[in-house]
Each structure stands twice: as C-alpha cells, then as structure tokens.
Regions:
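C-terminal cap/loop subdomain of S1 sulfatases and analogous C-terminal strand-loop tails that border
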Residues: 1, 6-83, 114, 133-134
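Long, internal low-complexity/basic segments
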Residues: 8, 54, 64, 69, ...
Length: 141
C-alpha cells in the first residue's frame, strides 16, 4: 500500500482512538490497512510547481495502484510508468498505454483544480545564458 507523509498524523490519531474533524486534517488513516482489514486503493499526488538550484523543475504526479503519471510543465509532456514492473521508472509507457495515461491525466487535473494548485509561470528575470554558464537559475541564489 503506497503511503505519503500526510497520512501519518491521521493514522496515529486513529490508532489512539482520537476523533478529529475531517476538514481539519489532510491525509487518510492507514490504521485499517495496518490491522489487515482492507487495502488502500486511492490516488497519491505530488505537486512541485517550482525550480530548485538542485535541478528540480516544475512537475505534478499521481500514483494509482501500480501506475504513476508524471506531468512535466516545461515540456508539457507526461511520463507513465508501471511501478510493479519498473520501480526505477526507466521505461516510459505513455505511447504504449495511452488510455491509462489519459485516465491518470484526468485524475491529476481534477485534483489540481480541487486543491486550487498554483501552476508554474514564466520567470521574467530568468537568464538562460547565466544558467548555462553557472549551472544556477538566475534569481535563486
């Protein structure tokens, strides 16, 4: 069962028998999964709309079951991986499984709208020549 850190608090308070208002806590309790009562089959989302000196570029992703879709904002492309068969994400299956990619794209887009996610936008102070010369993004150091 895939988990994400925001599930930890919900799981701990559930295990402790504490009731909390649903609207105040992100994440889902995994206590029923830990007790063997059920499997979790829900999407897990990542959203990183920023650039980082370490080389990270804006992307969003969703994992549902064995499948993971990554949307790259710079190139406006998607990558699709079957994590059961390819945990290292080496073989992009976007062209081989277009229906699965479209399905996960719809799930991701719906979630981005639901949470009113900030989408990346162009940085008017970005200097491509400086980045190539220094390896750093203009305006971030």
């Amino acid at each position: 069962t895939p988990v994400i850190t925001m599930d930890l608090f919900s799981t701990i308070i559930d295990a402790a028998g504490v009731k909390a208002k649903d609207e105040t806590i992100d994440g889902v309790s995994l206590w029923p999964v830990i007790k063997g009562e059920k499997e979790s089959e829900r999407p897990i989302f990542w959203h990183y709309p920023h650039y980082h000196n370490g080389g990270a570029r804006p992307y969003s992703a969703v994992r549902l079951g064995d499948w993971k879709l990554i949307k790259q904002y710079e190139s406006d492309t998607c990558e699709l991986y079957n994590l059961k068969e390819d945990i290292g994400e080496r073989k992009n299956l976007r062209d081989d499984c277009p229906q699965k990619a479209d399905e996960l794209s719809r799930v991701l887009e719906k979630w981005l709208k639901t949470v009113d996610a900030q989408l990346p936008s162009e940085n008017p102070t970005w200097d491509a020549k400086r980045e190539r010369k220094t390896g750093k993004y203009a305006g971030l150091d």
